[in-house]
From Swiss-Prot:
Listed GO biological process terms: glycine decarboxylation via glycine cleavage system
Protein name per UniProt: Aminomethyltransferase
Pfam families (alphabetical): GCV_T (PF01571), GCV_T_C (PF08669)
Keyword Transport recorded: no
GO molecular function: aminomethyltransferase activity; transaminase activity
Catalytic activity entry: N(6)-[(R)-S(8)-aminomethyldihydrolipoyl]-L-lysyl-[protein] + (6S)-5,6,7,8-tetrahydrofolate = N(6)-[(R)-dihydrolipoyl]-L-lysyl-[protein] + (6R)-5,10-methylene-5,6,7,8-tetrahydrofolate + NH4(+)
Family: Belongs to the GcvT family.
SUPFAM superfamilies: Aminomethyltransferase beta-barrel domain, Folate-binding domain
Length: 369
């Protein structure tokens, strides 16, 4: 049965076009995906991300457990509220999921994992947690709203209890704090996001979500759907689980080397495979590509390179750039002479560094000569 977030009726009242996303009935747009994309790049937009799964971990050995479970090192998390982006791997080094882990207290960490991988993640985390005597608690009582864009933070801070406004305005990137609204609603406010823009991802009780959403709306934050969320995150060079990596792809093959910490003396699941790939090189690489000819790049299209065949992963038309952009996975080595097969026609591609867009502007080289 399709699941609904607490904001489902609110989306429908706003005229949202609803689609099935990983078993959830979610808004793809509220009239114009392109307008919503530009709204986030230029001002502020908000997304219902209540389909994401919040998992609280409690126990004396919870840090030790996460040192074993995750490819990035939670030893970097020393201050309450600090967050870390990481992959959770299987023994073959494949990505079970990518997630954010928050350090709350020494015996309490919080994970935010993807919606489509919820069942798999909870089973895997539960299996691994047992021998560390860590309690795993899914927080189905929470909703989550992401407010993103250059004016997002100031619009959210205006709605907070004035006593908390200063701390919220000083909150660093990839950090979170417990705060409350002017009406006394408890918020877990994280300076994170999936758009390449500044902003907050806000976890709050489901019972308060509709009123908070409406308060944001009244304060000039426009609703945005999953369509804009996808084009924004791809412009920002951010991976989507299931398209850009999965259980059969290692972080080195998904341009996620920066999320791996091969620190001394820490044995984590999948480490031996990663050490081998680091020493010998991964057989495949993920690159950013731009198509200067008209058309759209789509997941699964065949890519030809000097090193052999690959495929398009995430692909879209970039509203900011006015061109088709994508991630592609191709054999390691040369990325010269790139072409994509579109209905039997070979169309040239340019390999570029990503993010494609930063601070609302094309990155150097992305638009070509």
């Amino acid at each position: 049965m399709t699941q609904k977030t607490i904001l489902n009726d609110t989306h429908r009242a706003l005229g949202a076009k609803m689609v099935d996303f990983g078993g959830w009935d979610m808004p793809i747009h509220y009239g114009s995906q392109i307008d919503e994309h530009h709204q986030v790049r230029r001002d502020a937009g908000m997304f219902d991300v209540s389909h994401m799964t919040v998992v609280d971990l409690h126990g004396v050995r919870v840090r030790e457990f996460l040192r074993y479970l995750l490819a990035n090192s939670v030893d970097k998390l020393k201050v309450s509220g600090k967050a870390l982006y990481t992959c959770m791997l299987n023994p073959q080094g494949g990505v079970i999921d990518d997630l954010i882990v928050y350090f709350m207290q020494e015996e309490f960490f919080r994970l935010v994992v993807n919606a489509a991988t919820r069942d798999k993640d909870l089973q895997w985390i539960g299996e691994q947690a047992a021998r560390f005597e860590v309690r795993v608690k899914e927080r189905a009582d929470f909703a989550m709203i992401a407010v993103q864009g250059p004016n997002a933070r100031s619009k959210v801070i205006d709605l907070l209890d004035p006593a908390d406004a200063s701390a919220a305005s000083k909150l660093g990137r990839f950090a979170a704090l417990q705060t409350r609204t002017r009406d006394g609603v408890a918020l877990f406010l994280a300076r994170t996001g999936y758009t390449g823009e500044d902003g907050f991802e806000i976890v709050l009780p489901q019972a308060d979500a509709v009123a908070f959403w409406n308060a944001l709306l009244a304060h000039g934050v426009a609703p945005a759907g999953l369509g804009a969320r996808d084009t924004l995150r791809l412009e920002a060079g951010m991976n989507l689980y299931g398209q850009d990596m999965d259980d059969n792809v290692t972080p080195y093959e998904a341009a996620l080397a920066w999320t791996i910490t091969l620190d001394e003396g820490r044995d984590f699941i999948g480490r031996s495979v990663l050490e081998s790939q680091k020493a010998q090189g991964a057989p495949r690489q993920m690159i950013g590509v731009v198509m200067d000819e008209k058309g759209v790049l789509r997941h699964g299209q065949k890519v030809l390179s000097a090193g052999g065949e690959g495929e398009i992963l995430s692909g879209t038309f970039s509203p900011t750039l006015g061109k088709a952009i994508a991630f592609a996975r191709v054999p390691a080595g040369s990325i010269d002479d790139l072409r994509v097969d579109i209905r039997g026609k070979q169309v040239p591609l340019r390999a570029v560094k990503f993010p494609f867009v930063r601070d609302g502007q094309a990155q150097p080289g992305v638009l070509g000569a």
